[in-house]
């Protein structure tokens, strides 16, 4: 209700049943409650593969089935020819879709125009919001006096996400723009004091002032991943903490992980979640003591 009052343009229905009917094809939910009682006039769309009856779908007040028809055994055209729906029902389904496109100027956009100028002007504002969000979410799970790093400390960095932005899969697989990798963020913050190794030796680990190990998971909807880290990441952490007690483990994940066997051996553990486009900059500043990990 608060979202509608704020002018939200689109509502997605859920996967569950409400009063015995699937939410995405429920006239009670979409027409009576959402459009009637709450006064929503925008676009309504299904979640992916969440409706099962084309006639109910059309008569419910739904506008878009995503990602397309999958379970229905009859088309809208067939329903129309059988008299089970009318052209007015189709018009009612299409009208909010077209109105939403007009509202956001989609029909005014040129075919090769990726971003409208007024949207491009807002990118710095959006980047600042992304940085602030990541900054306020970082959690310091453990710190045995190592952080913040002392001036002049040299860092050996290794692990999964030096050059990749960790993110979820499915609807969480948002690539973003102007992404800053962990490698770039560390180089910006520490310059020549940070070195990188793809497969560090035991001797390299032991010789470093501080070791930073980047690990994490790629979480996804509808998939139950193992609670443990990927085996290669788990092995790398074990090697690092075994060779150098001054090891910082940076975890980027969308949920919890098993840390048994190394949590009490690492000097510090940072939980950075999925960092987005600017989150690694925030993590670098936490390491340097310029930002408080207050998540």
What are these model-predicted stretches?
Residues 2-6:
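Alpha/beta enzyme core
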Residues 1, 20-25, 39, 45-54, ...:
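C-terminal non-catalytic regions of proteins with extracellular/luminal or membrane-system context
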Residues 8, 66, 105, 109, ...:
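Residue-level signal for secondary-structure boundary elements
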Residues 9-10, 63, 267:
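Short acidic/polar active-site loop segments enriched in Thr and Asp
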Residues 13-23, 31-134, 212, 250:
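Active-site or pore-adjacent capping/gating segments
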Residues 28:
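Catalytic core of the metallo-beta-lactamase
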Residues 7, 61, 244-246:
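Glycine-centered short loops/turns at secondary-structure junctions
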């Amino acid at each position: 209700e608060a979202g509608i009052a704020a002018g939200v343009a689109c509502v997605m229905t859920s996967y569950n049943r409400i009063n015995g009917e699937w939410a995405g094809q429920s006239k009670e939910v979409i027409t009576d409650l959402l459009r009637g009682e709450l006064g929503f006039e925008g676009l309504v769309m299904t979640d992916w593969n969440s409706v099962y009856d084309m006639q109910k779908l059309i008569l419910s007040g739904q506008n878009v089935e995503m990602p397309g028809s999958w379970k229905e055994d009859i088309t809208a055209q067939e329903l129309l020819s059988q008299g089970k729906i009318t052209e007015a029902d189709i018009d009612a389904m299409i009208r909010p879709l077209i109105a939403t496109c007009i509202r956001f100027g989609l029909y005014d956009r040129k075919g090769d125009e990726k971003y409208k100028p007024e949207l491009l002007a807002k990118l710095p504002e959006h980047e600042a919001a992304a940085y602030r969000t990541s900054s306020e979410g970082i959690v310091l799970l453990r710190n045995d006096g190592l952080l913040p790093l002392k001036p002049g400390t040299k860092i050996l960095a290794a692990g999964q996400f030096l050059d990749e932005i960790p993110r979820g899969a499915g609807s969480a697989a948002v690539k973003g723009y102007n992404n800053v990798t962990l490698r770039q963020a560390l180089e910006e913050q520490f310059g020549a004091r940070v070195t990188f190794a793809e497969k560090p030796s035991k001797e390299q680990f032991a010789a470093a002032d501080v070791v930073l190990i980047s690990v994490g998971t790629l979480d996804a909807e509808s998939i139950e991943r193992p609670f443990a880290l990927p085996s290669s990441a788990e092995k790398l952490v074990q090697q690092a903490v075994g060779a150098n007690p001054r090891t910082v483990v940076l975890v980027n994940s969308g949920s919890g992980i098993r840390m048994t066997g190394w949590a009490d051996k690492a000097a510090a553990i940072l939980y950075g979640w999925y960092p987005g486009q600017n989150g690694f900059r925030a993590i670098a500043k936490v390491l340097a003591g310029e930002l408080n990990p207050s998540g």
